[in-house]
């Protein structure tokens, strides 16, 4: 895991994405050795250090057989590598995470004519508060640069990314999260008011929405369980017991019953009211899953069943 040496807020003038080698061949070495590395092999390292960009561009113009646009793009990328400040930020992507760093100004030419800059501190895959920067939690307008065919490029939404790395809340996201929490709390109250049969029906719908297939009619054919369900995607069969109100003793009794059946891979005990401490049960019984009121309410929201619940309680 690569962590920053100083968890200080960033305020870069520029942020650049850098592809670390063709096909990512230098990604692992750069991250572990704390460097950024540029290919673009040429005899013009000293010209680049001196800022003689006309000479550099002429080399790449010849290399590109007179293609002005390609030579300009090449030169601009090389120039960024040499000239970005120590306060500017470099990003790359590896194993579905965003990594960022700042680099020392000195550019060092290696024997193969590739060049490196040493990272200040170390590469980081977290924001300054230690939260992982996973690709699935980053705006696609930032992560799309993974498909860039060149080596170095600017990014869209630089202000957004600075906030992301600095661990700052995005106002519209925080507002929506607060609304979602309020909705979930309201759903909890509606769930608590359900008739026991309607509560069972709601849980049946949750399993169905998640892709589980029911083997028998709800609560009709088996005395020991309310739902006998199978997941085609995981190929697991589950024993499901549903109670509006329950006790610790009752849950443990049903766990003993579940263990008497060989055909089930896991058990779900679903309830909305229980006064006892149940925090140790899932640890003691790894294949047993307890769904309390908060968990059920969250699943109702995620499964799109809030309107069904409202209509049932109306």
What are these regions (language model features)?
Residues 2-314:
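Mixed-charge (Asp/Glu-Lys/Arg
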């Amino acid at each position: 895991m690569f962590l920053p040496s100083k968890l200080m807020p960033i305020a870069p003038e520029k942020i650049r994405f850098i592809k670390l080698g063709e096909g990512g061949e230098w990604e692992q070495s750069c991250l572990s050795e704390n460097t950024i590395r540029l290919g673009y092999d040429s005899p013009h390292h000293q010209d680049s250090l001196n800022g003689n960009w006309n000479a550099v561009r002429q080399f790449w113009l010849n290399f590109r057989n007179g293609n002005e646009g390609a030579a300009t793009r090449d030169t601009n990328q090389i120039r960024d590598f040499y000239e970005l400040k120590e306060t500017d930020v470099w990003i790359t992507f590896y194993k579905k995470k965003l990594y960022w760093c700042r680099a020392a100004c000195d550019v060092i030419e290696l024997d193969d004519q590739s060049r490196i800059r040493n990272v200040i501190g170390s590469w980081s895959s977290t924001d300054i508060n230690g939260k992982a920067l996973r690709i699935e939690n980053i705006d696609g307008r930032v992560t799309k640069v993974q498909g860039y065919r060149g080596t170095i490029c600017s990014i869209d939404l630089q202000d957004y990314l600075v906030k992301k790395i600095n661990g700052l809340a995005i106002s519209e996201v925080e507002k929506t999260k607060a609304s979602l929490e309020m909705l979930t709390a309201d759903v909890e109250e509606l769930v608590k008011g359900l008739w026991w049969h309607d509560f069972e029906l709601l849980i049946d719908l949750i399993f169905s929405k998640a892709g589980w297939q029911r083997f028998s009619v709800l609560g009709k054919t088996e005395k020991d369980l309310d739902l006998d369900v199978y997941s085609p995607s995981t190929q697991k069969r589950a024993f499901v017991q549903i109670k509006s109100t329950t006790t610790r003793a009752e849950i443990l009794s049903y766990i003993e019953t579940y263990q008497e059946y060989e055909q089930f891979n896991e058990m779900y005990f679903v309830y909305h009211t229980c006064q006892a401490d149940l925090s140790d049960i899932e640890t003691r019984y790894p294949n047993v899953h307890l769904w309390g009121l908060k968990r059920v309410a969250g699943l109702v929201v995620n499964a799109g069943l809030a309107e069904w619940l409202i209509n049932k309680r109306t």
